[in-house]
Amino acid sequence: MKFGWIKTTGTDSEERMDSVKDALESSIPGIIAEKDEISSVRELGNIKIVSDSLDADVVLINKGEDLEILKSAKLSGKETAVYVVINTKDDEVYATEVSKLDFVDYIVLEGSDWTIIPLENIIADLFGEEIKIVSVVTSVKDAEAAYEILEKGVDGVVLIPNDINEVKDFSKLIERMNSESVKLDYATVTKIEPVGSGDRVCIDTCSMMEMGEGMLIGSYSRGMFLVHSETVENPYVATRPFRVNAGPVHAYILCPENKTKYLSDLKAGDKVLVVNKNGETRESIIGRVKIEKRPLFLVEAEYNGENLRTILQNAETIRLVGEDGKPVSVVDLKVGTKVLIKPDENARHFGMAIKETIIEK
């Protein structure tokens, strides 16, 4: 996962605290702050503080300073970082060597001229190491380039922002860099039938979803159905664009990093994956999970000779995604209807994808 920090800017403490507020409002997870302003930052909100103080969450030293400080910080449970300004080949060598020390978590690299920062060399030299490489930049455009350099890119970026709009754009960039793309395809409905009542899970998120977005849910790991969010207007009940009526407690849901969870395991604060009709994804935080007894409906579909099944609540407001990305209510499903699924050749073990033969029926 890519991450981003903001470096506080301004000529006085008030201006620097404005930088902190901008970061908090834009969901930036960390900030490089002056050591004498750590308490002021904490008063504004919960954010990771990087500073040259043992009171910080990430203890930072500059090149040439005593590495014993980081050893002590690590022993006390802190994360650690070394800040290196790259001007010469010696700076590059130092950055590479210090990054291999087991008590250094982050190497923060700043170049006097962005175009000649030897990030490629450092990324290549540190391939396979546990260190997180962080680049300091002064624009969102340079941040994007740093995230993508040598395909792997840096792990994190420190932005020295010019204004709040740049911070917001930076936040959007981080979200986009961390978005996963999933392959969707159409399966053909072969059977629809009521199966009685069971415990159904509604997922209420902290995000507003749009038409064509939902979550991937299924009884089988090898094929999950795109269940549409409650964004469609109807005459019976108000829309709930933050909600997906997902299915019964046993079903899988696709979560970030290609992991699955049982619907029954979800709770407030967990992250789930919102997926649109094109397979583009974004993370969303669960605000509430509701489990209620409701009438259920079996949906069976065929994909490449395999039968896939899921169970959904038997209600007009529950929809899958049909042809052309249009939502189709479960009560309107017919044999032959095409619906979007995510096919998967992997089995699942504690939510992780594995290569194993598992029979699901």
UniProtKB/Swiss-Prot annotation:
Gene Ontology molecular functions: 3-dehydroquinate synthase activity; dehydroquinate synthase activity; NAD binding
Superkingdom of source: Archaea
Signal sequence segment: none
InterPro entries, alphabetized: DHQ_synth
Catalytic activity reported: 2-amino-2,3,7-trideoxy-D-lyxo-hept-6-ulosonate + NAD(+) + H2O = 3-dehydroquinate + NH4(+) + NADH + H(+)
Alphabetical keyword list: Amino-acid biosynthesis, Aromatic amino acid biosynthesis, NAD, Oxidoreductase
Keyword NAD: yes
GO BP annotations, alphabetical order: amino acid biosynthetic process; aromatic amino acid family biosynthetic process
Known EC number: 1.4.1.24
Top EC class, one word: oxidoreductase
Annotated function: Catalyzes the oxidative deamination and cyclization of 2-amino-3,7-dideoxy-D-threo-hept-6-ulosonic acid (ADH) to yield 3-dehydroquinate (DHQ), which is fed into the canonical shikimic pathway of aromatic amino acid biosynthesis.
Family, similarity comment: Belongs to the archaeal-type DHQ synthase family.
Name assigned to this protein: 3-dehydroquinate synthase
Organism of provenance: Methanococcus maripaludis (strain C6 / ATCC BAA-1332)
